[in-house]
């Protein structure tokens, strides 16, 4: 059994007789595919990894079909960082910079004055949006406050990013009191203390079963079947073309003339190029 079998997987687990539940996720290929088409500074890569892990853990709490968007907006050199994830663990991320960012910049140095916005969007029903002030040193601490405020449940988040065997990796754990409140108040504190001892080489380089045994070998832990985590952008020629149709014919003709008769629409998330000439644009109009 090798650790790779649990790369890009999310596990849920339950502590028997403790009324506490947990989640563990590790993103390897899904994280590297997010970074492949961009040249983000290390500090931005790490922040996106943290946000991807947080989004994966958040979407795992959904009890309906839908998606969650975790977004940071600020007035610093990092203008925007955005991650979107679905209940089926399809995830995508992007960042927009408006200044120089060094590899050792802190969250607040990158963001300046900013907010963290979490949008929960079920396929059916109303959206819910929560706004979190970025007044703590790390995104993890800000998100813990969000959980306790929005769900009023004690929550612990562990999020780590870095490299393992020369490849980028992001991983994390969530520990949360069950809503029924049937356990002892000390149960969560006991398990949180154990969880906090996890090392990078364990969360990056062990299978979920091995890591959970190391942390909680005296506990009864029920582990559920994993979900695969995948990078999925969702862009298409149709979506890119729809954006062009919002532009007037006169302006389109001008753009086509400036670009030798072909407009290059590049997806900001995955970097895919979609090319449209006048014939392709006319066909899109006929399909409206």
From Swiss-Prot:
Task: Tell me the HAMAP family matching this sequence.
Answer: HslO
- Protein's UniProt keywords contain Disulfide bond: yes
Q: What is this protein called?
A: 33 kDa chaperonin
Instruction: Note the SS bond partners.
Output: 233-235, 267-270
Q: What is the lineage of its organism?
A: Bacteria, Pseudomonadati, Pseudomonadota, Gammaproteobacteria, Pasteurellales
Please tell me the species this chain comes from.
Actinobacillus succinogenes (strain ATCC 55618 / DSM 22257 / CCUG 43843 / 130Z)
The yes or no answer to whether the keyword Chaperone is present is yes
InterPro entries listed in its UniProt record: Heat_shock_Hsp33 (IPR000397), Heat_shock_Hsp33_C (IPR016154), Heat_shock_Hsp33_N (IPR016153), Hsp33_helix_hairpin_bin_dom_sf (IPR023212)
Q: Which family does it belong to?
A: Belongs to the HSP33 family.
Q: What does this protein do?
A: Redox regulated molecular chaperone. Protects both thermally unfolding and oxidatively damaged proteins from irreversible aggregation. Plays an important role in the bacterial defense system toward oxidative stress.
